[in-house]
Swiss-Prot record:
GO terms for molecular function: dUTP diphosphatase activity; magnesium ion binding. Its EC number is 3.6.1.23. Pathway: Pyrimidine metabolism; dUMP biosynthesis; dUMP from dCTP (dUTP route): step 2/2. This enzyme is involved in nucleotide metabolism: it produces dUMP, the immediate precursor of thymidine nucleotides and it decreases the intracellular concentration of dUTP so that uracil cannot be incorporated into DNA. Substrate binds at R62, S63, G64, N75, T79, V80, D81, K89. It is an enzyme of class 3 (hydrolase). This is Deoxyuridine 5'-triphosphate nucleotidohydrolase.
Length: 145
C-alpha cells in the first residue's frame, strides 16, 4: 500500500519501518516538548497523510517508552481516519515522577495501518443470552482456573 505524505514542518521525517518484520513504523517529534510528571503533552509529528478508503492509522505506544520512562500514548491506540488531512499529533502521558523531555527527531510513538469495517447497527428488544450475561469488570476473576 502506498500512502501519500505531506511534510508541513522542516524537521518532519517520513515514517519508515525499522525491520523487515515490523508491523509499526516510527513517528518522530518535530519540536522539543517537556511533559511534566503526571501530565500530558501534545507532540507534533509535522506530517499529513492520505490513507485509502477502508483503512485507518492507529497511533500506539512504543514499548520502550512505556517500560523505561512510563510514557504512553494517552488514547492508545489513537485513530487517524482515512478522511482526515490535518497534521498528525500524538497525546503523550507521563506517568512518572520526573520531567520527560522530547527532543527533535525522537521516536515518540508508532503507527500501524489497519483495515476498517463498517457495521450496520440493528435495534432490537432483547439480545441473545450467553453464559457470561452482563458480567464485566473483573467478573471472570484474575486467578488461574
Amino acid at each position: 500500500m502506498k500512502i501519500k505524505i505531506q511534510k508541513i514542518h522542516p524537521n518532519a521525517l517520513i515514517p519508515k519501518y525499522q525491520t523487515e518484520g515490523s508491523s509499526g513504523f516510527d513517528l518522530h517529534a518535530v519540536e522539543e516538548v517537556v511533559i511534566k510528571p503526571h501530565s500530558v503533552g501534545l507532540v507534533r509529528i509535522g506530517i499529513c497523510l492520505s490513507l485509502e478508503v477502508g483503512y485507518e492509522l492507529q497511533v500506539r505506544t512504543r514499548s520502550g517508552l512505556a517500560l523505561n520512562h512510563q510514557v504512553m500514548v494517552l488514547n492508545s491506540p489513537g485513530t487517524v481516519d482515512n478522511d482526515y488531512r490535518g497534521e498528525i499529533k500524538v497525546i503523550l502521558a507521563n506517568l512518572s515522577d520526573k520531567d520527560f523531555k522530547v527532543q527533535v527527531g525522537d521516536r515518540i510513538a508508532q503507527g500501524v495501518v489497519q483495515k476498517t469495517y463498517k457495521a450496520e447497527f440493528i435495534e432490537c428488544e432483547q439480545l441473545d443470552e450467553t453464559s457470561r450475561g452482563s458480567g464485566g469488570f473483573g467478573s471472570t476473576g484474575v486467578s488461574k482456573a
